[in-house]
């Protein structure tokens, strides 16, 4: 068991990529440069304890690797709107995010996901990958649109298997979290927003109705 102080520190800093702390503006610049350096580093073979704070204590990192990459992708997408002059740089960095998200050291299938016929009960990984692919399409192009659509349809079908409209997050784990389902729905909305489709409309309506009726107190 962890010492409680250590555990609290892990939970408080788990997503703190490379553990950077400083004044807001200075800290943001340092964080961006650290992340940029990480993404442009060659020979990626998975995250290390020097990349993710939580891995100093938990070897596999509780899935913080794909979540950290998802956060990076959203940041680059947002930066492309606020600072369009640097879009080429953000496109390059987002391409590196996708490469790492699909890497066998990050994806739970341990092989090229394009060769995986059934995506299974890996909703946690897929929700973040789907967000990454949506961000990529938004500012880079359609290279991964087929995979993006495949994941959307898989998550929708899996969600509809349950009366509470919550997709599976991990194999052999029955627990579901509404925050993750909201992220799943957001990832599908991002695909719809990019492509003028309505794949997630029905599921979103049913999930919101279920949450309003049974999921709040």
List the predicted regions and their residue ranges:
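Extended ligand-binding clefts on enzyme/binding-domain cores
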Residues: 146, 174-183, 187-217
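Extended ligand-binding groove/face enriched in aromatic
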Residues: 68, 76-182
